[in-house]
Amino acid sequence: MLFRKITEDIRKWYLNSSTGLLIDGARQIGKTTIIEDFLSSNNIDFIELNLLENKLALDAFNSSTNEKELMFRISALANKNIVEGKTVIFIDEIQEAKDAITPIKFLVQKAPYKFIFSGSFLGVKMKDILSVPVGFLTVLPMYPL
């Protein structure tokens, strides 16, 4: 696999940040692959939910009324034990959720996990945002090679 500078940016975030991480970029440039490779190669426990492929995960994001309900649904969908303070929760294709940004703020603020989100065309698709996650989200743009 080619080395990508963003890998080092992800590493710095993982080691030093208490915010969520959002990798934003065009479709099919390797966002999911780079995140999965980083987590796997560093032996980091993680779960992955793809909101485009998993309609139950999308429904969890769209219909949960608070972060506790959303975390309950995420844990049910994970098919593995989620360990507080250890498991990274990776939500792929976050742009599919109708208001993805608002739950991100409350998840990062109140849940004892690290969150990584990835998506495409987020600036175009995001609307009806109820609460902007200022200070709760690190955004890393990713570009094609």
Language-model-detected regions and their locations in the chain:
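Phosphate-binding site recognition
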Residues: 1-145
